[in-house]
Every structure is written in structure tokens, then in C-alpha cells.
């Protein structure tokens, strides 16, 4: 069975036997590559998240897993604590700024060490590009990472992956 998500102008739907509504007002960035009512597989959504920083995909996937962004953030906090990341508090799945959203380099190292135990993690986050297949409304398209360490423009010995991000408030 395939999990799919659908994004429209007023909300998003994830279906896996049932449909759940995602409140897009929780997204402070506009959707990156998804179109109104476009259906993507979970794998396509994760590639969009990892390569194109598709914050809309992060939120939709979170709702599909936990029912709401808040519930998913709570699960993230619980898992972080289990891993010993005690100076971390998440409020969203996409990392966009929030005064109650914080972590430390040590905690992120703990979380990353656990993520690296999953072989699919590097498949998604170590990819420099992905050919997204055609969807119900869009032709096939290329996602290309702008991270200079992933696309080969710069190098760092031993680097397995890296994730960049940018917001106005982070300047």
C-alpha cells in the first residue's frame, strides 16, 4: 500500500485508509515544488524535504504520522529525550523559527547518530538530486540540491551528508 499526500490551497490531505487534514496556515514558507491537489508518494515528499527544503512536505508528513504538527513535535521531543538530547525542544517538523524551538550541537549529534542507523536516511539526505516522477498533475521534474557540500562544489573529508537552510530571522 502506498501513502500519498495531496496539497490544496486551503489545506492538505494524507490518505492511508483515512484522510487527515493539514492546516497550511502552520507553514510560514510557501510550498516549494508541490502544486494544488498534487499527489506525491511519501518517498517523493521526503526527497523534496531533504533536497529542496520543502517545509510543506515536512508538515504534511508530520500530520500523516501523528495527526497534527503539535502531536508530531511532542513525539520528536519524547524521542529526543530518549536519546539523551535534553537541551532540545521542537515545536514544528520543519525547523522554521519559533521562540520555543531550540537545540544544541551536542543534542543534534545525538539525534543524527540515531538517524544514521537507518540506511534510508543517507539515501534521502545524501542525495544531490532526484528525478521526481510524473504525478497526477505534473510532469516529471528534477530536484537539485543547492548545498555545495552535496553537489560537489566543495568538499569535506568524511562528510556523509549535510543539510542547509535559510530564513530571514536566521541572518
Give the location of each predicted region:
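A mature extracytoplasmic/lumenal domain signature
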Residues: 22-24, 36-38, 63-65, 94
Amino acid at each position: 500500500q502506498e501513502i500519498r499526500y495531496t496539497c490544496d490551497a486551503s489545506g492538505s490531505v494524507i490518505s492511508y485508509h483515512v484522510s487527515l487534514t493539514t492546516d497550511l496556515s502552520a507553514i510560514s514558507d510557501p510550498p516549494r515544488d508541490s502544486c494544488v491537489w498534487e499527489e506525491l508518494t511519501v518517498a517523493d515528499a521526503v526527497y523534496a524535504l531533504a533536497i529542496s527544503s520543502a517545509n510543506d512536505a515536512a508538515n504534511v508528513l508530520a500530520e500523516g504520522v501523528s495527526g497534527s504538527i503539535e502531536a508530531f513535535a511532542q513525539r520528536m521531543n519524547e524521542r529526543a529525550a530518549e536519546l539523551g538530547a535534553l537541551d532540545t525542544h521542537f515545536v514544528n517538523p520543519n525547523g522554521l523559527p519559533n521562540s520555543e524551538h531550540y537545540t544544541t550541537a551536542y543534542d543534534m549529534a545525538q539525534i543524527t547518530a540515531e538517524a544514521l542507523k537507518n540506511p534510508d536516511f543517507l539515501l534521502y539526505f545524501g542525495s544531490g538530486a532526484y528525478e521526481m516522477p510524473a504525478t497526477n498533475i505534473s510532469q516529471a521534474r528534477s530536484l537539485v540540491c543547492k548545498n555545495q557540500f552535496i553537489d560537489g562544489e566543495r568538499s569535506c573529508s568524511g562528510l556523509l551528508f549535510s543539510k542547509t537552510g535559510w530564513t530571514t530571522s536566521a541572518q
